[in-house]
């Protein structure tokens, strides 16, 4: 769970300090800087970015990113619509509900968090229910409105388009895509370049950690 991940992060930071790993924060590295370092190996672990699909009415002005919400960079209104019922959407919905927000979670697939392991999934769904999150599945968003969405039930191709509105905030959690701004460019002057974690393929934290450990033992 989140508590285990939090403890793991603390452990990894402590180990880095123990072995003298230089850590630089709040700095966006450039190709020029990397070239000047003349490294033998570069590991690209730049993560993923929020996926913004081509849906009418969707723009950066009327939706919030899950990461900004979870990190406290933005504050939502009382009534919140979370679009996307994957792990990030479900976790965001839970987070907001625990802050006494009135949350609705909408998902196109017939089930929520379909890729989550069978042990963690029931617990997360139970948390959503206990936190009184309204969950709407089989709902394909047709258009984003200033205060909601229109959607159609995927089980009925010719069914009516319904409106879900009256929200103060909308959080977009419809997926992530790999973010690797210069992995290919690095190969021009670095002999060994490895892309791992979400930068390779958006997934779960334990998968990224496994890739990192596996790579570290082979370099």
Short names for language-model regions:
Residues 1-3:
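Short glycine-enriched, charge-decorated loop/helix-capping segments at active-site entrances
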Residues 6-51, 58-78, 98-185:
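A Rossmann-like FAD-binding core segment of flavoenzymes
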Residues 55-56, 206:
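Short acidic, glycine/serine/threonine-rich loops at helix termini
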Residues 84, 151, 208-211:
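Short, surface-exposed amphipathic charged segments that create phosphate/polyanion-binding patches used
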Residues 84-86, 175:
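Glycine-rich Rossmann-fold phosphate-binding loop(s) that bind the pyrophosphate
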Residues 87-99:
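N-terminal Rossmann-like FAD-binding beta1-loop-alpha1 element of flavoenzymes
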Residues 89-92, 111-123, 181, 187-190, ...:
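A conserved FAD-binding loop/helix module that cradles the flavin
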């Amino acid at each position: 769970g989140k508590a285990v991940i939090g403890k793991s992060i603390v452990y990894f930071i402590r180990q880095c300090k123990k072995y003298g790993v230089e850590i630089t924060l709040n700095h966006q590295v450039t190709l020029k800087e990397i070239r000047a370092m003349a490294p033998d190996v570069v590991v690209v672990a730049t993560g993923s970015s929020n996926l913004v699909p081509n849906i009418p009415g969707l723009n950066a002005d009327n939706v919030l990113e899950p990461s900004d919400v979870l990190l406290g960079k933005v504050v939502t209104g009382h009534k919140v619509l979370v679009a996307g019922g994957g792990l990030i959407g479900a976790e965001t919905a839970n987070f907001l509900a625990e802050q006494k927000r009135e949350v609705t979670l909408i998902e196109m697939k017939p089930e929520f968090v379909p890729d989550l392991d069978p042990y963690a999934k029931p617990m997360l769904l139970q948390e959503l229910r206990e936190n009184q999150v309204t969950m709407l599945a089989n709902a394909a968003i047709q258009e984003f409105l200033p205060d909601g969405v229109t959607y159609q039930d995927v089980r009925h191709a010719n069914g009516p388009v319904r409106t879900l509105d009256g929200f103060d905030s909308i959080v977009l959690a419809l997926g992530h895509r790999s973010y690797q701004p210069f992995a290919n460019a690095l190969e021009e002057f670095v002999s060994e370049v490895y892309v791992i974690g979400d930068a390779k393929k958006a997934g779960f934290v334990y998968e990224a950690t496994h890739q990192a450990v596996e790579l570290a033992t082979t370099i």
